[in-house]
Regions:
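Early extracytoplasmic/domain-onset interaction patches
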Residues: 69-74
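Bacterial N-terminal signal peptides
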Residues: 5-16
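Long, low-complexity, polar/charged, intrinsically disordered or flexibly structured peripheral segments
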Residues: 150-209
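Acidic/polar low-complexity flexible segments
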Residues: 21-47, 103-176, 225-287
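Short amphipathic, basic-aromatic surface patches that mediate peripheral association
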Residues: 93-100, 226-227
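Short, solvent-exposed beta-strand/turn "edge" segments of beta-rich domains on protein surfaces
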Residues: 77-82, 100-102, 209
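Short, well-ordered beta-strand segments enriched in hydrophobic/aromatic residues
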Residues: 84-91, 214-220
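Exposed beta-sheet edge/beta-hairpin loop segments within beta-rich domains
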Residues: 205-212, 229-234
């Protein structure tokens, strides 16, 4: 009888320990209310006043082509001013990869959001048939094109004397009203294999590569006229997922570093005081 009681107590203790050891969900991103407009520059020192949250990334192992994961950590900061919302992503990468060729790939980053405010969370793996997601993807080559930069010389450094274009794109960039390719593409997705680019994008992006680290800002109006869009309401919580591609490591398409759970993003109410950061941008972990 004593043996049975002892076994029962042991099982109860093991169950209790297992319940207590159940991993908690990811920490939330606080979307801080700012009064004077969101920060559009990735290197604006004002970002240092915004709390950061670091997220571990893992290789995509759900569907072919599996792989990636060379970037192990990304830092997220976010703000809104009642009119626009902005997210800044930072991660370490030993090289800035802006070229695309047969055997070269670009660096890129993406944030995914549920469409609308669903009662049931979509699959964190690019959504599902009943619950689509919208994905904002920034790519290093798009950003270079938008700025009118020439990537020909980067890829063929010894061929600058044989210029095949009528004029340098950097000159065209100075023309009033010039705008090249958007640095951000919006997609709609209902699961793996359904990724579809949208005809128009309402998201703007900017990037900076310095000291082995990418800093990327993605921003959008809080309200849009598109019903198939993420919804951001001050004082409420949305959610997001993250992905990073390292071109140097041949990461493209499904080969990427990702978060495997939805991350809560809590928007401050309008008029909330701006928080002081507990840690600065320099504390992004180098792994």
């Amino acid at each position: 009888m004593l043996r049975i009681c002892s076994l029962a107590i042991t099982m109860l203790l093991l169950f209790a320990h297992g319940a207590a050891a159940e991993p908690a969900g990811p920490a939330e991103v606080r979307v801080v209310f700012v009064r004077d407009g969101v920060f559009t520059s990735p290197t604006d020192s004002a970002w240092d006043e915004i709390p950061e949250t670091n997220y571990a990334l893992l290789a995509q192992q759900i569907t072919p082509p599996i792989g990636g994961g060379s970037v192990s950590n990304v830092c997220v900061r976010a703000t809104h001013d009642g009119d626009e919302i902005a997210f800044r992503l930072q991660w370490f990468d030993p090289s800035a990869d802006r070229g695309v060729g047969v055997d070269t790939f670009r660096d890129a980053a993406a944030i995914g959001f549920p469409v609308g405010r669903p009662n049931v969370a979509p699959s964190p793996f690019m959504g599902d048939e009943a619950h689509p997601v919208v994905i904002w993807q920034w790519a290093a080559d798009f950003d270079a094109d938008a700025e009118g930069k020439s990537r020909f010389g980067e890829r063929y450094p010894h061929a600058e004397g044989v210029w095949i274009f009528p004029q340098d794109l950097s000159v065209r960039r100075k023309v009033r009203g010039w705008r090249g390719a958007d640095p951000v593409i919006e997609y709609i997705s209902k699961g793996f294999g359904t990724l579809t680019p949208r005809m128009e994008t309402t998201v703007e992006g900017a990037s900076e590569y310095e000291d082995g680290r990418w800093s990327v800002v993605l921003r959008r109006k809080l309200e849009t006229s598109n019903e198939v869009d993420p919804v951001f309401i001050p004082g409420t919580t949305s959610s997001l997922i993250l992905a990073i591609w390292n071109g140097e490591e041949k990461e493209v398409n499904g080969r990427k570093a990702v978060t495997y759970q939805w991350i809560p993003a809590k928007l401050d109410g309008i008029g909330s005081p701006t928080a002081k950061a507990d840690v600065g941008a320099s504390n992004v972990r180098r792994e």
